[in-house]
UniProtKB/Swiss-Prot annotation:
UniProt cross-references to PANTHER family, sorted A to Z: ALTRONATE OXIDOREDUCTASE-RELATED (PTHR30524:SF0), MANNITOL-1-PHOSPHATE 5-DEHYDROGENASE (PTHR30524)
Keywords: NAD, Oxidoreductase
Phylogenetic classification of the source organism: Eukaryota, Fungi, Dikarya, Ascomycota, Pezizomycotina
Name of the featured protein: Mannitol-1-phosphate 5-dehydrogenase
Function noted in UniProt: Catalyzes the NAD(H)-dependent interconversion of D-fructose 6-phosphate and D-mannitol 1-phosphate in the mannitol metabolic pathway. Has a strong preference for NADH over NADPH.
GO molecular function, a single term: mannitol-1-phosphate 5-dehydrogenase activity
Amino acid sequence: MGKKAIQFGGGNIGRGFVAEFLHEAGYEVVFIDVVDKIIDALKSTPSYEVTEVSEEGEKTKTITNYRAINSKTNEEDVVKEIGTADVVTCAVGPNVLKFIAPVIAKGIDARTASKPVAVIACENAIGATDTLRGFIEQNTDKDRLSSMSERARFANSAIDRIVPNQPPNAGLNVRIEKFYEWTVEQTPFGEFGHPDIPAIHWVDDLKPYIERKLFTVNTGHATTAYYGHMRGKKMIADALADAEIRQIVHKVLEQTAKLITTKHEITEQEQNEYVDTIVKRMSNPFLEDNVERVGRAPLRKLSRNERFIGPASQLAEKGLPFDALLGSIEMALRFQNVPGDEESAELAKILKEMSAEEATGKLTGLEKHHPLYEPVQNVIAKVQKDSK
């Protein structure tokens, strides 16, 4: 039997990042989704194209050898597939992990193979696989928990690849940047060894990679989007062509760099080179990366361990400067009532109906005694005053 991977989420990242590399590693990919349109398209199309875009031009790869199942209507089939799979991955968004966990729990419980399945969540969130594992354990019989490691091994990952908005007639085809990083911890696999996926960079300690990525790529990307949105820019590359926005982004990333080099064994030179690479990637006009796409879901992006409050809170605890990040937080708070983005409407409602104190707790999860609490509360009060 050939190798088989189950990929939850048939969206752009699922098809254009995860499945591309699983396919190249020789896996049959079984897509799982609840969106009829995506499943029907995958079932009726034997191949699709992934086009990697860079300043050097474009390179197109054809993806084949996949199937698709709708977990909403065919849950038992999904359970059977997980029962005989080598790998389970997902790219569904951190908020959806709790919804896919019950069927994964059933699939893991049904396994009889001697080698455990590798479970790797590919989400923009710290410890996403741990989060998924927690939900899976909640959906597993207590007397089966102690032996679960015989049936599944869970590894956290850090993913990095820009997937812009796709052309309206793209169908299953995905345009994606050429650059990527997919880093996964290898220690959970123990004596079984990690899956054979050449695109993955396997490491013993993932935390430095996750924090460096989240607090550089995601912080920089979102900062560019929110400042760009306030200035009426349509594309990320247009926003970074504005010298003032570019300077602000560099200032923000200087502050997060200080945190990263202080905490982890990453030198200032390594981090500076990483920042330059990231800003260059985001400035790529060929990606046609939309400001509103990058800015969407501001509530999640303003939460406690995310790209702004996460690094700013740690800097505040260390007595290091975080003023540039406060600027990003302010611009994120001003991303309100953007068409097609429910969270931006919810943000506007919270800021309108709550006091600055209530909104600070609700949006950021910061404790009142935290050194970042008062500065953020002041920014929230300022945004509320400007909105009146």
